[in-house]
Amino acid sequence: MSGDASAELLRHLLAQRYGHEVEVPEGVAGLPELLHIAGQSSHRAWSAAPVAPELVKLLAACALAAPSKSFLQQADIIDVRDAARRAAIHALVPGMPWMADAPALLVFCANGRRFKHLFERRGRPFTNDHLDGFFHPSVDAALVMMNSINAAGAAGLVGCPISMIRNAPERLAEILELPPRVVPVAGLCLGFPAQARQVNPRLPLAAT
């Protein structure tokens, strides 16, 4: 696709998304990547094609390159492959049948344990035992999940985040055998799309 055609398609996608035109500067680089980001939608219908563990590992390696608060790297990705664990997690959110059918299920965790462990290794008292100990790892986990969605899209996959796994965090932590201070933030179903999705509207840019 030519640069002019890509720019026109990007303008069209953004107008669909926001209900108004967004200027695409002439000569802007990275139009294919911008088109992918502008056209994102959550998917809940998967093809029968499996998602190989090797592909998930590659996506995780790309996703974990996301920015991290103070380089502490307080986010983890769990690739839930065990059928019994998948069933137990799905039982926590039974109103989502498409979750059970997803070829891959990832759980993104805020890891507040890693920072505390650094203090323990040096024999020092932990001085950050307050809200930041949860907030910063949660932001790290969110950044890693968004990177995962972008990486998956680049590989031809689609996904849908699942916040409802937090409805029973203690039970989910038990299913995943998480240590203390490692908190599940969100799930992400991944698969190859069974069909195209429409662009979902967003508030106008002026609203932000």
Language-model features and meaning:
Residues M1-T208:
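Acidic, surface-exposed loops and disordered segments
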